Curated annotation (Swiss-Prot):
Membrane spanning stretches: 55-72
Protein name: Altered inheritance of mitochondria protein 36, mitochondrial
A GO cellular-component term linked to this record: mitochondrial membrane
Localisation: Mitochondrion membrane
Major localisation: mitochondrion
Top-level taxon in the UniProt lineage: Eukaryota
Keyword Ubl conjugation tagged: no
Keyword set, alphabetical order: Membrane, Mitochondrion, Transit peptide, Transmembrane, Transmembrane helix
UniProt family annotation: Belongs to the AIM36 family.
Repeat recorded as keyword: no
Presequence positions on this chain: 1-14
Length: 287
């Protein structure tokens, strides 16, 4: 009974307080403080979440970095199927072989002339080309360069710049990187022009080169301008498809097309062709 009286008194006091002017002043304050408390609570919760999100992002970034590092290590351990031109350039830098600018500048084009033959099967035609060039200018020397022979000499000389690379590639049965043959030819021509032989006006006849348009462009960038690309009509038509794989045949024909597009291709005929020797002599005189 006494407890009920106290509860009743408290309810009456509360009702009286709520309807009093003082309560009207206190209530907004209580409401506002409660609302502010909720906002502070959300900010605290957000602040707690931010470090977690940041931590997760850091972990993801570290995971990707670790995966990239491991995969790159694995790729480096994988045996190379072939060497790219950029990798060959890196090899030159690592071995101390400095790449130089163009060997024969434009002001020397009249002194040193380059005649390239992408494919030749019958070497007797080389002699005819030499004879024709000798007729047009007897004072000029003719030098025949065989890249296959240069590569063989480079491999056999253990002290040569590219000997180790050539032997390693051959041992692993890997193709030569783009630019390697041109670099060996450049090395040889550089040797020739810096000897007594280099004082003479010279025609350089390079056989079975270039066999890709990339090598052709590289030659003119690194060595000198090509005067003529000689296309051996009979050999290209009959021997080339029988002697080399289809891909190499296509590459050599692309070389012919490239030089034809810049008006440097000259078709040479032989006595084995349908055309007669008289027409052949006319063609040779145009060199």
């Amino acid at each position: 009974m006494f407890r009920f009286q106290r509860i009743g008194q408290q309810l009456v006091r509360r009702e009286t307080f709520l309807h009093s002017p003082r309560a009207k002043l206190v209530q907004p304050y209580l409401f506002n403080s409660q609302r502010q408390y909720v906002i502070v609570h959300k900010d605290l919760q957000k602040a707690k979440k931010e470090p977690r999100i940041r931590y997760i992002l850091y972990m993801i970034a570290l995971s990707w970095a670790a995966i990239f590092f491991v995969s790159s290590k694995v790729d480096k351990k994988k045996p190379m199927q072939s060497m790219t031109e950029r990798e060959f350039q890196e090899y030159e830098k690592q071995t101390g072989i400095k790449r130089r600018h163009k060997l024969i500048h434009s002001d020397q084009n009249s002194k040193y002339k380059f005649y390239v033959i992408p494919y030749i099967y019958n070497n007797e035609q080389i002699e005819k080309i030499e004879q024709s060039l000798a007729k047009s200018d007897p004072n000029r020397k003719n030098v025949v360069i065989d890249p296959a022979k240069l590569v063989l000499e480079e491999k056999e000389d253990e002290g040569a710049k590219y000997s180790a690379l050539l032997n390693d590639l051959d041992a692993m049965k890997k193709p030569y990187p783009p630019g390697l043959i041109t670099a060996i030819i450049k090395q040889h021509i550089n040797l020739l022009i810096n000897t007594r032989e280099g004082t003479f006006d010279t025609n350089y006849i390079i056989k079975n080169y270039p066999q890709t348009t990339g090598e052709a462009i590289k030659f003119e960038n690194d060595i000198g301008d090509i005067s003529k690309c000689l296309i051996m009509h009979y050999d290209m038509l009959n021997e080339l498809p029988q002697q080399l794989p289809e891909e190499k045949v296509r590459n050599i024909r692309n070389v012919e097309g490239y030089f034809d597009s810049v008006n440097k291709a000259q078709t040479m005929v032989s006595k084995f062709d349908i055309m007669d020797e008289k027409f052949e002599e006319i063609i040779l005189e145009d060199l």
